Amino acid sequence: MLTAITGINWGDEGKGRMVDLISQEYDIVARYQGGNNAGHTVKNERGKFVLNLLPSGILRPDVVCVMGNGMVIDPHHLDGEINKLREQGISITPANLKISDRATITMPYHVDQDGLEEARLSKTGAQFGSTKRGIAYTYGDKYMKKTLRMGDLLHLDDSVHKRLVTMVDSKNLVMEGSYNAAPISVDEMWAWLEKYAAIFKDYICDVGQYLADADAAGKKVLFEAQLGALRDIDFGIYPYTTSSNTIGAYAPIGAGIPGHKLTNSVGVMKAYSSCVGDGPFVTELAMTEEEKHALREAGHEYGAATGRPRRVGPIDLVASRYGVFCQGCDEVALTLLDVLDYMEKIPMVTAYKLSDGTTTTRFPMGEALDTAQPVVEYLPGWHCDITAARKWEDLPKEAQNYVEYLEKAVGCKITYISVGAEREAYIHHVV
């Protein structure tokens, strides 16, 4: 069984929390794209955990975690993340963590270039809101065949050294010529690679074969996405996207088993909207600054990876319907419903008014999206604490009505509803 858990919106939907919940039913959890540019926050009986690179299944002792070939991995960050979790009592060994030999390495100069370019763009207001983790530059070099992969750490021989020299020479033309930065040292980069080769050599393997064998043996595999459909490099709000494919259809490819097909796709959707970074975000126009501040504080909307305040707004049903379509969702997990407890009436963006005066429920692109205005409708709020609810019947009628409205609006059944940060604070809603 191959299941993908993906984001329906801009990311930060609560995928890590849902993976932590659902992974108890699975043998393997695999990340298939992205790097340490976004974070998954999981709170359970053992504490609060922030994960950037590691799959959320790492918090379950009986689950094997896989980092697939579609990922870009900063070994320095990964080492720190592993050590932090070990300090929190989480066991991480080659037995429960396997890293693809085909995953691309984020080098220190990728991170440096990201920061330098964002600083350059910010002078003219043209920045993208990068997390400055080197993600775009790693993926860019991957497609130009100018970087190394984790498998190269297993044989740091003369051929790898020659490739490194060529890559550094090419990168220095940019670093010195465009940014007037200090040149990159081949010797320093080689020492850096040797350090992390020693740390990760026992974790690196052919994860594609591992997953194929596991699937053939009847093991259950859960694919974990980073970010959401609206950040996908092809189907997201370009150019305000990430540099990888966040959609579930890419999961088997990015994990290492490209010939396999998903059995089930679970899309994760917030009960309201949030976004980190620049680009059009129509729903934020539906609230006053005071209303947005109240929602941000109620939802603790600050980036797990960056700490930046997230942009917020009502749930955007135009964007969410498009996200469900992109992800091919069979079911939806609705998160953070309890955040809306304080609202007397619940706003929803149900359509966009375009600059030509027309109204649409289809998600537009380009200039049409840039200038779109939200059409807002309201449902009565429940205005009470729902964090103790564990069954559908425990929810106030107003909360039930809201969930049912969302189901019809996005065209997909909602089977999970989270009503709190703790692991057990959810409702499994099967009709």
Per-region residue spans from a language model:
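Non-transmembrane, aqueous-exposed alpha-helical and coiled segments at domain scale
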Residues: 1-431
